Amino acid sequence: MDVRCINWFESHGENRFLYLKSRCRNGETVFIRFPHYFYYVVTDEIYQSLSPPPFNARPLGKMRTIDIDETISYNLDIKDRKCSVADMWLIEEPKKRSIQNATMDEFLNISWFYISNGISPDGCYSLDEQYLTKINNGCYHCDDPRNCFAKKIPRFDIPRSYLFLDIECHFDKKFPSVFINPISHTSYCYIDLSGKRLLFTLINEEMLTEQEIQEAVDRGCLRIQSLMEMDYERELVLCSEIVLLRIAKQLLELTFDYVVTFNGHNFDLRYITNRLELLTGEKIIFRSPDKKEAVHLCIYERNQSSHKGVGGMANTTFHVNNNNGTIFFDLYSFIQKSEKLDSYKLDSISKNAFSCMGKVLNRGVREMTFIGDDTTDAKGKAAAFAKVLTTGNYVTVDEDIICKVIRKDIWENGFKVVLLCPTLPNDTYKLSFGKDDVDLAQMYKDYNLNIALDMARYCIHDACLCQYLWEYYGVETKTDAGASTYVLPQSMVFEYRASTVIKGPLLKLLLETKTILVRSETKQKFPYEGGKVFAPKQKMFSNNVLIFDYNSLYPNVCIFGNLSPETLVGVVVSTNRLEEEINNQLLLQKYPPPRYITVHCEPRLPNLISEIAIFDRSIEGTIPRLLRTFLAERARYKKMLKQATSSTEKAIYDSMQYTYKIVANSVYGLMGFRNSALYSYASAKSCTSIGRRMILYLESVLNGAELSNGMLRFANPLSNPFYMDDRDINPIVKTSLPIDYRFRFRSVYGDTDSVFTEIDSQDVDKSIEIAKELERLINNRVLFNNFKIEFEAVYKNLIMQSKKKYTTMKYSASSNSKSVPERINKGTSETRRDVSKFHKNMIKTYKTRLSEMLSEGRMNSNQVCIDILRSLETDLRSEFDSRSSPLELFMLSRMHHSNYKSADNPNMYLVTEYNKNNPETIELGERYYFAYICPANVPWTKKLVNIKTYETIIDRSFKLGSDQRIFYEVYFKRLTSEIVNLLDNKVLCISFFERMFGSKPTFYEA
């Protein structure tokens, strides 16, 4: 029997079992049940003394146990690490057992199961059926997984089944209540193992009149009275709410491979199951594959107060307890963890994922026709957009113009769409799927048949969006890749944090190397310095800036320095200069390079003046070996990705290489995380110290380098910054560039693993050509060992606000001057939620203007400053006098929470007062909108005091009174503060700011 593993899960009844859900080549689903064990590692001496004897035991052979406590010394008299060798046993017990002196107890039982039996969680196997006992059709028991799964076979493709769903609930206030508000719609996108896709929506007929129901039937809707009458081929079905809920129960109890929702764990599934129990007393019941255990669908919460989010809200995740092998997947939770977005609402996520440039085909009266294909945007973007358009009802044009779809024509790689839209002047516009321009509260207030049918379209679109996002993020291949890499079940891949997922690969490595790492002392945590961030040399750059990044800097630092808890010889600290001098002189004699590397770190305690960590590089340590495995596997999958021919293979290999990249980059963080199995304080701080020296070394050879006559003269000798080696240190290097090229280079900024180097040219093509040659020369001549850099991009018209804050037009390494550059806003107000739309629009306008001025190159920095400030004053005065912009542009949002230090915090007071006077109260954890409002007769206010008292909560019913105005000065001051930080002339900026606002601006720290 050939099977592919698709999920592993446990039953937690009286008899615990582990189950595998697998699929055969013919699409048949097979479940295999295994005994569940708890695992313990003990020495032979303890094993022999156990009474009663272990249930099962396997010999692990001779293993080396190393004490990895850090040795801190004030001199070079460092004691050797404690190390012992003994025969070890792996004990399997069906129930928890207290065994003294058991080791390796930090690893998960499921990881022990996979590794001890030689099973890959996502592997394909030809099963030896003599080790299988049939329980029922499609379910077998296996007591010997090692022999049953002994024959691994090449991966083969299998079909999967999915249920994507969304619901709409009636509400008259802010949130629906399960006790009083019925479900009005449930929409499903059902994909079976044959690949057949069914789209259907159930409409609650109890919210319609009998006349409307009859009209709906006349218009093609199916009306049913019971579950038995359901026809899944019909798109629209009318039924009572009880029938609607029973159909949901029937669907959710099926064994799909995936049931996918958006925030469904917290809302949709919970609402369905609670409403079902309330109206019928029935529950959604899952049964284990052997049919011996039944559990009710239940949502349980996991609160991690140690990982508090914004405003002190605990990180809460929601989980479905099922035992039938279906993976209940919440896209909302997944995207929150994997993407950094301004908002995690479904419309914001879809806007980010599905957009493309569309060409204007026709302009009519209040309507416009757009066409999109591979000629209007990058290949594939129009096709992805067109797929979503099949169920889409609204399209967002140019970021914020929401237009209703009138007609649409869709083909394989493109689309044509007619939108209800004001006439727009340009020939091309960005089209995206954002928020539908509907007010659900008002729709329920005016509810009738037409509205019910409209809502059905919105609901099925949201259900389909779950499918589109599922495919866009490649969740299925990421799940399989994670299971293989982390040695975890598919259902648990996204449940754990990095400190847990690393345990599987670490255990695998320790068993391969016959190593056990133990600690006898309590882990101590001290702060340490992070990566090197340079101060920007200036604000605005008319010349191009070349961006070079170290490839996997921290993983390669760990490999280069052999940084690992067991390779740490010790840490030498000094309390005075004399002690430090003596230690420095003797260190290199006792621990000579390259076998040893000595790393100067910042002292861990205030009474120390120096701290030096010493690592032995003769035998590769656990962390470097782990990282080398990850990086080698990533390189292997990247190579396979290039050679892959099918889209399935490409998706799998891309997910695998990405997963290895993520896990490799997480190792550095885990070295400094006290609860991690890889915790090593000295290794973590040595990693950042070596990383800082590497970025300083690269900056030192590039800053002041010159290219002329085909020769590149680096600014400094190419000397290894850690120890002398036999490399050629001559800074003059022959290039393959034309001999008439004459350029100078200047380092202008750097951050952790990247260097920004200005070239005195505005030619994009030449800049890219030179940067690629620089990349080759740096990797061949400047860098050493396993360090490599990569030319990432040319930044044109770079505007540096401060460290980690900049705006630029990016030309990637694979582009040219004719390519459309990407606008990058890193760490700036355009990416923040606590900034008004007015502010974002204005700052975007002024950055664009600055960028154009830099491109033209006609003005010096003083002229640019004068021109920008003069224009800004005109714009602000004009807005203040006309007061024409709508209130929506000035609204801000904030999350309501109670984690304030002061009991009378003004934010809390604002919400409390609002809740006293409004029936729709603001709940804890909810975002609310507010704006600064003052009396209309208040003149321009220079000195802003007590601005919190002008905050006013903006709800649906708020209207700006004739005796009120927007307190523009608050917004203007914040905007101007950001703009003056873009300009180079501080004197002019201070003068302008004092004249407008009566105070000096705050300049960002360089």
From Swiss-Prot:
Pfam family name, one: DNA_pol_B
Alphabetical list of Gene3D superfamilies matching this protein: Helix hairpin bin, Palm domain of DNA polymerase, Ribonuclease H-like superfamily/Ribonuclease H
Entry EC no(s): 2.7.7.7, 3.1.11.-
GO molecular function, one term: nucleotide binding
Enzymatic reactions: DNA(n) + a 2'-deoxyribonucleoside 5'-triphosphate = DNA(n+1) + diphosphate
SUPFAM superfamilies referenced in this protein's UniProt entry, alphabetically: DNA/RNA polymerases, Ribonuclease H-like
A biological process term (GO) from this entry: DNA replication
Keywords: DNA recombination, DNA replication, DNA-binding, DNA-directed DNA polymerase, Early protein, Hydrolase, Multifunctional enzyme, Nucleotidyltransferase, Transferase, Viral DNA replication
Record's note on what induces expression: Expressed in the early phase of the viral replicative cycle.
Record family assignment: Belongs to the DNA polymerase type-B family.
Its biological purpose: Catalyzes DNA synthesis. Acquires processivity by associating with a heterodimeric processivity factor comprised of the viral OPG148 and OPG116 proteins, thereby forming the DNA polymerase holoenzyme. Displays 3'- to 5' exonuclease activity. Might participate in viral DNA recombination. Does not perform OPG116/D4synthesis across an abasic site.
Subunit structure: Interacts with OPG148. Component of the Uracil-DNA glycosylase(UDG)-OPG148-polymerase complex; OPG148 and OPG116/UDG form a heterodimeric processivity factor that associates with OPG071 to form the processive polymerase holoenzyme.
Record's protein name: DNA polymerase
Gene that this sequence comes from: OPG071
